């Protein structure tokens, strides 16, 4: 076997630990070269020049024919993310390129972020004597279903909507019911477009198509169905919400809105940011456990591709965690010790210059983010 060349997004956790000759089962005469590149700098010319065997990415890198047309060496693409809207999987299949993504890697991280945001803005919902909060969840995959479990633990009622799944205890409502009857609506859907979408002139078309498209799922019409008192949280994909419609809605209703993702990310307009109750730089999934789990999953998949047994587990790299959900949910005063979401909000707002947060500053906040811990369920 020839030496293995890997081009990797430099923001993927623990690259050195997982992607070295010993961890990948290579013999001592073979080398594993890991070339670290900022995710937005992985381009067609770079891949044509380097001709890597393996490409490890995050959601900021678009994988499609335009990127790989002049590369004939890549045999494996791994995305250390849950979402796949940045990857043209049909094209990879045509090229016989193996693809793996980190399904479920950050489900606890994101769900815990949402709970933290809710209880920071509406701490009264800690009280069991309160009328139970009704939490609407749109999208009941790995993250949405995990959030539903935490909500149940807190005694909250869940209204869930996912047209792609069978009816269940949590998939129990229509979109209309979720919008109209919830105290808080949290979005956990992939970014998808109509199957007949005309991509000509589209600013940012996804690589996913669906009978239930989610681009601008939250728009002027759907916002109008929601009570002004209903909080809206988006930690899924920015373009799921029409940003212009959202600004107009907040102006009219003073709605509490929490955004971790933005339609025109990585640039964020101050006009939107100033209206949000909480805004963070796409870090809902940024826990030590979530990041390591993402790396672990694509490492395991690459080992399978190379026909070697994985020899490293993320648990070998994790320090002791003292945050237990069983204790935290009974002691609300520990919430800020676990995660002060307002610090991340302040850090993002402090980057406003000339009426916006620049893309480079947004990316820097993500790159330099001090990974928090998940609480142990």
From Swiss-Prot:
Homodimer. Substrate binds at residues 59, 81, 286. HAMAP family: PdxB. Belongs to the D-isomer specific 2-hydroxyacid dehydrogenase family. PdxB subfamily. SUPFAM superfamilies: Formate/glycerate dehydrogenase catalytic domain-like, NAD(P)-binding Rossmann-fold domains. Its main location: cytoplasm. It comes from Psychrobacter arcticus (strain DSM 17307 / VKM B-2377 / 273-4). The keyword Chloroplast does not apply. PROSITE patterns: D_2_HYDROXYACID_DH_1. This is Erythronate-4-phosphate dehydrogenase. Keywords: Cytoplasm, NAD, Oxidoreductase, Pyridoxine biosynthesis. InterPro entries: D-iso_2-hydroxyacid_DH_PdxB, D-isomer_2_OHA_DH_cat_dom, D-isomer_DH_CS1, D-isomer_DH_NAD-bd, Erythronate-4-P_DHase, Erythronate-4-P_DHase_dimer, NAD(P)-bd_dom_sf, PdxB_dimer_sf. Its EC number is 1.1.1.290. One of its GO terms (biological process) is pyridoxine biosynthetic process. One of its GO terms (molecular function) is 4-phosphoerythronate dehydrogenase activity. Catalyzes the oxidation of erythronate-4-phosphate to 3-hydroxy-2-oxo-4-phosphonooxybutanoate.
